[in-house]
């Protein structure tokens, strides 16, 4: 009863307006050497869930992290989680995602008196909503558009994995400065029909 009472009141602890919530986030990465320092299998697993209260709409796309690597967070999609899906394409009260890639350093060379290497990282990403966000409201709004061909609020489809395939090229100087070029494609056209691409710095994780 004590735990139930605490969870029931957690939304009003901060502002009494229903914009407080208690959440849980787990993100773990693992790197497995396959062949010397030339080939590495790397993967990252993330789970984020809402325990109590209600997440405000303007915070629903936030992925919590202890180590700030990106300027912004964007739900599952874009360049910070599931590469190849439209930015903010998959959001919910709770989300889970997996990034898996092979990192192959295939060329070493010296240039301007610095050590460089080139690397490829073919990857497979996937994610899924594990807690829906205001699903009842989406269903209610869908009834108002029941006579339209494509419903903008609720498709009626059961949530499933959103997966992508892609590859990246890395130009690395002295092992600590990384220029990254990545391209990916969603395996379901509803997650994005065009080829996704991104130019930036560092590996994703």
Residue ranges with predicted function:
Residues 30-32, 102-106, 171-173, 183-185, ...:
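Residue-level signature of outer-membrane beta-barrel architecture
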Residues 119-165:
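Outer-membrane beta-barrel transmembrane domain signature
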Residues 121-123, 175-184:
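Conserved active-site loop/cleft motifs that coordinate metal ions or position small ligands
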Residues 21-25, 95-99, 162-166, 176, ...:
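Transmembrane beta-barrel architecture of outer-membrane proteins
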Residues 1-114, 130-132, 151:
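C-terminal outer-membrane beta-barrel translocator/porin domains of Gram-negative envelope proteins
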Residues 171, 176, 193-205:
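Outer-membrane beta-barrel "beta-signal"
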Residues 23, 58-68, 136-144, 196-202:
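Flexible, surface-exposed loop regions and adjacent strand-edge segments
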Residues 85-92, 149-160, 187-189:
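Short, contiguous acidic/charged loop-to-helix segments that flank catalytic cores in large enzymes
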């Amino acid at each position: 009863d004590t735990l139930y009472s605490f969870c029931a009141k957690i939304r009003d602890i901060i502002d009494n307006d229903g914009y407080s919530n208690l959440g849980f986030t787990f993100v773990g990465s693992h790197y497995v050497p396959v062949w010397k320092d030339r080939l590495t299998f790397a993967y990252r697993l993330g789970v984020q869930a809402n325990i109590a209260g209600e997440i405000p709409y303007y915070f629903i796309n936030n992925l919590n992290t202890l180590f700030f690597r990106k300027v912004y967070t964007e739900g599952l999609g874009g360049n910070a989680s599931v590469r190849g899906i439209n930015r903010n394409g998959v959001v919910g009260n709770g989300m889970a995602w997996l990034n898996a890639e092979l990192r192959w350093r295939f060329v070493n060379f010296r240039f301007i008196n610095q050590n460089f290497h080139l690397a490829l990282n073919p990857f497979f990403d996937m994610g899924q909503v594990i807690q829906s966000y205001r699903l009842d409201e989406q269903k209610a709004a869908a009834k108002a558009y029941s006579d339209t061909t494509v419903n903008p609020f609720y498709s009626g489809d059961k949530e499933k994995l959103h997966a992508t395939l892609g590859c990246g090229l890395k130009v690395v100087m002295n092992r600590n400065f990384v220029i990254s070029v990545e391209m990916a494609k969603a395996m379901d056209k509803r997650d994005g029909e065009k080829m996704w691409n991104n130019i930036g710095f560092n590996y994703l994780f």
